[in-house]
Amino acid sequence: MMRKLAILSVSSFLFVEALFQEYQCYGSSSNTRVLNELNYDNAGTNLYNELEMNYYGKQENWYSLKKNSRSLGENDDGNNNNGDNGREGKDEDKRDGNNEDNEKLRKPKHKKLKQPGDGNPDPNANPNVDPNANPNVDPNANPNVDPNANPNANPNANPNANPNANPNANPNANPNANPNANPNANPNANPNANPNANPNANPNANPNVDPNANPNANPNANPNANPNANPNANPNANPNANPNANPNANPNANPNANPNANPNANPNANPNANPNANPNANPNANPNKNNQGNGQGHNMPNDPNRNVDENANANNAVKNNNNEEPSDKHIEQYLKKIKNSISTEWSPCSVTCGNGIQVRIKPGSANKPKDELDYENDIEKKICKMEKCSSVFNVVNSSIGLIMVLSFLFLN
């Protein structure tokens, strides 16, 4: 049944696609034919118009040239008339006719001016002279006189007046004004300003100066003084204080601290050291001799039962109860176990079920050799809790995944 449905669907899809392609080909062919017809008609019309315009344009230009030639030469002297008579009756091509017309155009033209009515006209007279003009005009008059000039001009006017003077000048202006006055003076300046003011005053002076300021201020004051200085500073402060003192010093520091403290103290000391540590501990104890030297029992370096007991203790630590914290012995054994692989990253949890520890090297001790690491000051420890047994959980997860894959392969 499934095979029949698949064959039917594929056949239907191919049939519909074939119909669509046939329809598409027919439509594009029809559109192409109509487009070609339109292009042919447009091309023919444009070609006809272009040829017609070129033909009539050339004819019109040629006849216009002949007409202009006849118009220019119809009143010339007898040579031109003879040239026209000699050209009449000759059957020559258009090129010769055009050459003769061009020769006529190159001949000089005579000025034909309108003659005045009297018997002795001036051949150079201006034909546009006003017939009502004044016959007593000054021959030296300015030819560029303003025709709109004032006919009632002041005859006593200053001949040396400034031609660029302000026509809107104040008629009531002070005739005795200072000729050297500042032309860029402030028009809004204070008319009651102090005439004895300092001409060299600071232009950038503070406009908000305290009017009650001390007129006898210290002229040697520090110009770089702190503008945000404490106004309530201690007047009895030490004038010889250390200028390089720590600005972030603890304000609650012990004022009775030991002045003879060790200046070379360890800068990488453990900040989380036990505040209740034994103050009477042995200062000469060797922290690295716990399992070395000539110890007794299983601490002897060549004890054959030592590794057996350590492995047994490690197995017992792995089986630690969920409600118990990791013991010091468990921590020490785990540190020895991962001594060569410890780094600044947190190590895996020491147990797979229950409570364990994670350790790492403190960032300040990262450059120390691993043989010189101090477990108290250079190693950081924290407790980790494993709620599920990771080994059993991993086995169950792997089994379920394998079963699902096999079922999917064989059932299909």
From Swiss-Prot:
Annotated spans, Region I: 112-116
Short name of any one Pfam family annotated for the protein: TSP_1
Sequence segments annotated as region (41 X 4 AA tandem repeats of P-N-[AV]-[ND]): 123-286
One example of a Gene Ontology biological process annotation: entry into host cell by a symbiont-containing vacuole
SUPFAM superfamilies attached to this UniProt entry: TSP-1 type 1 repeat (SSF82895)
Record comment regarding domains: The N-terminus is involved in the initial binding to heparan sulfate proteoglycans (HSPGs) on the surface of host hepatocytes. The N-terminus masks the TSP type-1 (TSR) domain which maintains the sporozoites in a migratory state, enabling them to complete their journey to the salivary gland in the mosquito vector and then to the host liver. The unmasking of the TSP type-1 (TSR) domain when the sporozoite interacts with the host hepatocyte also protects sporozoites from host antibodies. The TSP type-1 (TSR) domain is required for sporozoite development and invasion. CSP has two conformational states, an adhesive conformation in which the TSP type-1 (TSR) domain is exposed and a nonadhesive conformation in which the TSR is masked by the N-terminus. TSR-exposed conformation occurs during sporozoite development in the oocyst in the mosquito vector and during host hepatocyte invasion. TSR-masked conformation occurs during sporozoite migration through the hemolymph to salivary glands in the mosquito vector and in the host dermis.
Name the UniProt record assigns to this protein: Circumsporozoite protein
Native species: Plasmodium falciparum
Gene this protein is translated from: CSP
